Amino acid sequence: MDLKLIELASGKEAGSVKVSEAIFGAEFNEALVHQVVNAYLAGARSGTKGQKNRSAVRGGGAKPWAQKGSGRARAGTSRGPIWIGGGRAFPGHNRDFSQKVNKKMYRGAMKAIFSELARTERLVVVDDFKVEAPKTKDFVAKLNTLNLKDALVITEGFDEYLYLSARNLYHADVCDVASIDPVSLVGFKSIVVTQGAIKQLEEKLA
C-alpha cells in the first residue's frame, strides 16, 4: 500500500511511499490495544505503601524486663504490635502492578494502532524532520508547516536538537523508533514519521 509523502520544507505532497500492508493495513483490534495500553500504564505505577512488621522494626532485641517477679505482664520484645513504636500486625507492602505483554501481543497492538492512524489520516509521513539548533520556535514552525499542533514526531535515531526543542511543549514530543510505545501513539492527535523511520518500523514489527 502507499502513503502520502509530505515535503517538510513546503508542507506539500511530494509523492508517495510504499509501506507494508501487514503493518499499516491491519484490522483494528480494540480489545488487544486496550489490554496493551493498560499494561504499559500499569507498569508505570510505583508503590506508595511501605510499613514494617515486628521483625522489620529497629530495636526490640532485648527482653524489656525479667519474666517473673515484677508483677507486670510477660514481655519478650518492645516491638510487638501492641507497643508504641512497635511493628504493624498486618503491614501494607508495595504492590507490583506490572502485567505481562509478550512480543506477539505488542506487535499486534502496534500494527493495529499504526493501521488505524493511517486509515484516519492521522499518520503523516515526511521526508525528514530536523532542526538546525535546539530552539523550540524552530520546532513549532515545522509543525505549523504541516498544519499540526498536537503531534508526536518519530525519527530514525535519537536527535538531541529535536529532543531539546520539543521538551518544553506539552502538546508535542519526539522519540525514535527504538523507544516508541503504544501509550504515546494513542495519546497524540497526529503522528509524524520520517521516511527512514518507516523502514525501521517495518523491520521492528515484521
UniProtKB/Swiss-Prot annotation:
Part of the 50S ribosomal subunit. GO terms for biological process: translation. It holds the Pfam family Ribosomal_L4. One of its GO terms (molecular function) is structural constituent of ribosome. Belongs to the universal ribosomal protein uL4 family. GO terms for cellular component: ribonucleoprotein complex; ribosome. NCBIfam families: rplD_bact (TIGR03953). SUPFAM superfamilies: Ribosomal protein L4 (SSF52166). InterPro entries: Ribosomal_uL4 (IPR002136), Ribosomal_uL4-like (IPR013005), Ribosomal_uL4_dom_sf (IPR023574). One of the primary rRNA binding proteins, this protein initially binds near the 5'-end of the 23S rRNA. It is important during the early stages of 50S assembly. It makes multiple contacts with different domains of the 23S rRNA in the assembled 50S subunit and ribosome. Residues 69-79 have a biased composition (Low complexity). Keywords: Ribonucleoprotein, Ribosomal protein, RNA-binding, rRNA-binding. This is Large ribosomal subunit protein uL4. Residues 47-79 are annotated as: Disordered.
